[in-house]
Amino acid sequence: MHHLIQEITKEQLRTDLPDFRPGDTVRVHVKVVEGNRERIQVFEGVVIKRRGAGISETFTVRKVSYGVGVERTFPVHTPKIAKLEVIRRGKVRRAKLYYLRELRGKAARIKEKTAQ
């Protein structure tokens, strides 16, 4: 039974998304349906966590909009994500960056990872 579930979910997994991790700044292009029309909405921010595995894997992106912190959680393998761009790679030592919620302004910046 377990192998059957794995076989079915394997077909649903996305392989077209770039590799990203907590601390990276990403731009997520989300398909939004309003009435009978569909449009693309862009959400740009820092990945503060990535959890789960397989089909149920999710990631949370945080941005500050007009002085208010906004966090949005996306399933990694959803067809609602049209495109995901990694803008910059962050250098962090934690898997969950919840401490960014308390930081304001320049203190909330993350060092950029240098290419090696």
Swiss-Prot record:
Which PANTHER family does this UniProt record tie to the protein? LARGE RIBOSOMAL SUBUNIT PROTEIN BL19M, RIBOSOMAL PROTEIN L19
Q: Alphabetically list the UniProt keywords.
A: Ribonucleoprotein, Ribosomal protein
Q: Which InterPro entries match?
A: Ribosomal_bL19 (IPR001857), Ribosomal_bL19_CS (IPR018257), Ribosomal_bL19_sf (IPR038657), Translation_prot_SH3-like_sf (IPR008991)
Keyword rRNA processing attached: no
Q: Name one GO molecular function term.
A: structural constituent of ribosome
Q: What is this protein called?
A: Large ribosomal subunit protein bL19
Any Pfam family hit: Ribosomal_L19
- HAMAP family named in the record: Ribosomal_bL19 (MF_00402)
Q: Report the record's Gene Ontology biological process terms.
A: translation
Q: What does this protein do?
A: This protein is located at the 30S-50S ribosomal subunit interface and may play a role in the structure and function of the aminoacyl-tRNA binding site.
Family under the similarity heading? Belongs to the bacterial ribosomal protein bL19 family.
Organism this protein belongs to:
Geobacillus stearothermophilus (Bacillus stearothermophilus)
User: Gene Ontology cellular component?
Assistant: cytosolic large ribosomal subunit
Q: Which domain of life is it from?
A: Bacteria
